[in-house]
Amino acid sequence: SFSRLCAEVGVLTPREVVVDLADPDCVPPTSADELGMEFPLVAKAAIGADYDRISFPGKRKIWFIDDAAELAGMWRSLKEAGYCSTFLVQECIPGDDTAMRSVTAYMDSTGELRLIGSARVLLQDHAPTMIGNPVAMITEAFPDLWEATGRLLRHAGYRGFANLDIKVDPRDGRELFFEVNPRIGRNSFYLTAAGANPMAVMLKDLVLDQRDEPIEVTRQVLYSLVPDGVIARYVSDEALRRRAKGLGRGIDPLRDPAERSLRRRVTI
């Protein structure tokens, strides 16, 4: 599992309990004593593809659970929807969206870290099925996170793109790795915006059999899918608001001068 691999190389993760709902004898835990963790808690599917196959009223990408009754209700909804896979219940780490970090890496076909970059999240989407997806970020170098990411991916024998979500615990400054997505992230354009096209790196490796020196993305840019006013209103950290404003207009991958469609422009 992800948490086991992290533990083997000294990478920190939140405490968690894995619940296998595919086991017909499984009785999902509902109390703090059963879980060994206090409420509030966070719950999510271990395998996103399995979760995407089901649909039910009130479905959420990530569940924030305040008490045993809410947890029991979640298990009931999953059972009624026919969900038969693993689910994770984790301790809830405090802190707002700005405590999140995104790391994108490419491990080439020889197993070496060929590209890495990262961003500080300003805002995330808060729609129930989209929660956790960043909508505004500042690209920034985080060498400690890069080193830990490389250590983890090499240990796993990983190849290809990986996108990792990390949160800094405001209580003690620990950097906790939440998950690794075994693909390039939906917001990976922040790398291109900062000067490193991940597709070019992949094509050189897999098509041309060429590997340049490893690329570390250090340029700072504002990557944003929302109007500047949204950042100004909802980012509570004044210093971060000033940083975002100082970087100028945000780079939005949806805005392309080559796209002439009036309908498209109105839509976005």
Give names to the regions the model predicted.
Residues 2-87, 109-111:
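Active-site nucleotide/adenylate-binding loops and adjacent lid/helix of ATP-dependent enzymes
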